[in-house]
Amino acid sequence: LPTNDRRQRQMCIRDSYIIVGAGSAGCVLANRLSSNALSTVLLIEAGRENNALSIKIPAAVLANLKNKTYNWAYQGEPEPALNGRQIQHDRGKTLGGSSSINGMVFIRGHALDFEGWRQSGCVGWSYADVLPYFKRMESYSHGGDAFRGAEGPLNVYRPNPKEPLAQAFIKSGEQAGYPVTDDICGYRQEGFGSLDRSVHAGERWSTARAYLDPVRDRPNLTVVTKAQVQRLVIEGGTATGVVYKDRRGKITNVHAQREVILSAGAVGSPQLLMLSGIGPAEHLQAMGIDVVADMPGVGQNLNDHPDFVLKYKCTQPVSLWPKTKPLGRVAAGVRWLLTRKGVCASNHFEVVGCVRSGPGVEYPDIQLTMSPVAVDDDTWKPLQEHAFQIHVGLMRAHSRGKIELRSSDPAVPPRIFVNYLQDPRDRVLMRKGIRMVRELVDQAAFKELRGAEIFPGDSAQSDTDLDTHLNSHTTTQWHLSCTARMGPKTDRGAVVDTSGRVHGIAGLRVVDASIMPMVTNGNTNSPTIMIAEKLSDDIRGYTALPRIEADFWQHPDFETSQR
């Protein structure tokens, strides 16, 4: 049946499952839960269909981020440690969510991330527990092995970097004494190597493409777009449904036979919990919201990866700058339209360095990624010269933020306080990362290609100088997470149990990046998909996949050596 007719039919009965948010996690759940023909699934998305051509083009990342049609573009609160600057937090507002507008970087995280989850009280989330689901979700371009999957819905591509700057990046890492890794999602994450991406046959491979598109015709799956959920319906301590406003402004109340599942992301899920009376009682009362469950952890523990960019001139014409000029863009676009190949078929983050900030650090806490074109921080337009940039990302920041309601009106965006560099230890680590980049580009492999440092510039050497630039230019890597974290019920800061069930509320789960206890070491899209895969089995009552006790590399002398 067409979607509208199907919806009218199902309005007469209860849906087995209601999923709020058709993003990176929601699309996975819609696929897996609707595989049982006896269950009906309603997937509600505030955004629209993701059929824009720009979403398919891997190189159009910045264009998609600038397009508010597909981007929530939340404006953060003034950051105290960043001169009061307000950081924009881009989140996908379309089918596929952020997987439809992100940079397509695919990093699972380090094995010890998940050992940390287990040690924090999240039994069943160790590396051995999650590896089977990482494998199940992917179809890796280099085939399956002990670590990688070969038959999953999500196509993951490993590039073979041939551009001079990419090769110089990896070679310089080796010359600086770091290991070279064959697969950052495999046995060894630490080191320099190729950076996987969720791209297939020259097109972005979002969770909408991978999980939702193949099953849109299932008669027991209904997808409603341009519909914003206003609140959850809680009756006698049980979530029984949701209230949403459709594209015409009509308010609709829908009921769930089994469960309501929030997959609205690290911003949207805690916002909806609080709008529904689940959250810190004092804050809810201040917003005029009746308290259903006093849960102080909702919206707290906000994690992100701070980002700082260094820019360098090229001494040879090896950057992508000419391809960004009007004629170059037209030529690249035509080639992509005809062949799905060329410059437009890449996200241009092809290499990465996962490094430790110093002796005693167990596993990488700094991520270095290179782009073969430098852009202006404010306009995101390419610098009009041959240049490249290297991003310093802090993978385990000590600073924590929070999300609070600005209003009891669901249409009003919440307040986002990340508190970047508020903890002095984060500032120390970011300075170390900047100096690592400078050491990297000073190696022989880079010296042939690298000119002067455009930003922050050779004059910025002291801690004070670097802090000045960190204050004015630190930004986000768009990895907001951990705002409804997993943990035992005895932990007052925990919001959900290890099955994603909200403590104290029956029939309600959260399944997305907000339930991470702590952010993973790398881009968060891959672990978010894994979370949805794993919990889809739990929701259906399936036995978890058998654990995989795979070995992983850790520097044998990490206690005394930085590399």
Predicted segments with their positions:
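Single conserved hydrophobic/aromatic residue that forms the stacking wall/gate
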Residues: 1-9, 13
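FAD-dependent oxidoreductase catalytic-site/capping-region signature
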Residues: 10, 14-15, 131, 137-188, ...
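Loop/turn elements at helix/coil->beta-strand transitions in domains of secreted/extracellular proteins
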Residues: 14, 36-41, 126-127, 219-222, ...
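N-terminal glycine-rich phosphate/pyrophosphate-binding loop and immediately adjacent elements
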Residues: 10, 14-135, 295, 305-314
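Glycine-rich loop(s) and the adjacent beta-strand/alpha-helix scaffold that form part
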Residues: 40, 47-52, 57, 232, ...
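Conserved redox-cofactor binding core of oxidoreductases
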Residues: 118-239, 243-245, 309-333
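Residue-level detector of alpha-helix initiation sites
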Residues: 19, 23-28, 266-267, 515, ...
